[in-house]
């Protein structure tokens, strides 16, 4: 998502514990009536979040975080960084959109393994029932460094998201800013495989990238049905599927002058798919696209030694 204004702090408690908090303003929606915008009003969209990081050992870390989105410029209960937002949001009864998350990170030598779980609209009473409102997203991945005894890194990730996450019964309190999802960039009702490899070979910096992403619908009707415990089968109303392969190479021609070459291939099933607005019948109008792209760029790094 695009940047948005925030204010916050981070504080260390000893060597093993770190706490951070921030407050921010997301996009503000202006709502006018049908006759004139002169009688319109603004709907504020604010976010408060805090995170606790704890190192059990030098190799094992757990992150706990909580955030809430609400339709007021300020909410004193959420300005307090040490309050627990989930019960407060239920107590206020304003349909504030609260989320919880937990991350486990394990370092083995110079490699990293992690799993992240994001819970939206957690309903404690229905947690273990077949029909529940525990909407989740999770990510698992690993990062290998110097796997070929050189300066290189391999990242592998898999992300899965429920079709109901990021939404809210109050549509102005969704988990978006300026139309882009916060957190996992693929958004709701999706799954994503990502492989990313970077290495340095002599004067060449090489970046190889592979992405396989599938995304389904999340309409207003589907969200409202979810609050009534009427659930949709995954991808039953259509989807888009995209595979991307890309290579990016940069190298220095002469002092401070570098060139970059990129070659990419995209295979896109149901190109132009709109997960939020398209009627089901419009899927018949979508097409599959295969595309190869090439780009060449030049970069010059100017240094003014007098400013040093």
Pin down the residues of each PLM region:
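Surface-exposed coil loops of outer-membrane beta-barrel proteins
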Residues: 1-54, 63, 67-95, 99, ...
């Amino acid at each position: 998502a695009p940047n948005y204004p925030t204010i916050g702090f981070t504080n260390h408690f000893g060597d093993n514990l770190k706490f951070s908090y921030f407050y921010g303003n997301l996009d503000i929606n202006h709502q006018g009536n049908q006759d004139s915008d002169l009688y319109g009003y603004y709907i504020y969209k604010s976010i408060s979040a805090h995170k606790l990081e704890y190192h059990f050992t030098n190799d094992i870390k757990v992150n706990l975080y909580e955030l809430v989105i609400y339709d007021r410029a300020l909410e004193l209960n959420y300005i307090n960084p040490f309050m627990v937002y989930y019960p407060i949001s239920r107590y206020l009864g304003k349909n504030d959109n609260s989320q919880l998350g937990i991350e486990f990170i394990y370092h083995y030598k110079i490699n990293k393994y992690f799993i992240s779980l994001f819970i939206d609209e957690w309903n404690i009473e229905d947690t273990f029932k077949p029909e529940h409102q525990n909407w989740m997203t999770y990510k698992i991945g690993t990062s290998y460094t110097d796997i070929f005894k050189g300066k290189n890194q391999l990242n592998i990730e898999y992300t899965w998201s429920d079709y109901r996450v990021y939404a809210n019964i109050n549509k102005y309190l969704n988990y978006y800013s300026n139309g882009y999802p916060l957190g996992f960039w693929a958004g709701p009702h999706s799954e994503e495989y990502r492989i990313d490899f970077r290495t340095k070979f002599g004067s060449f910096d090489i970046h190889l990238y592979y992405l396989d992403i599938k995304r389904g619908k999340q309409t207003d009707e589907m969200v409202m049905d979810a609050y009534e415990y009427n659930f949709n089968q995954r991808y039953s109303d259509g989807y888009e599927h995209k595979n991307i392969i890309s290579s990016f190479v940069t190298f220095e021609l002469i002092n401070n002058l570098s060139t970059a070459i990129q070659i990419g291939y995209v295979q896109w099933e149901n190109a132009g798919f709109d997960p939020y607005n398209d009627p089901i019948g419009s899927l018949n109008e979508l097409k599959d696209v295969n595309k190869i792209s090439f780009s060449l760029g030049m970069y010059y790094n100017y240094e003014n030694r007098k400013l040093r």
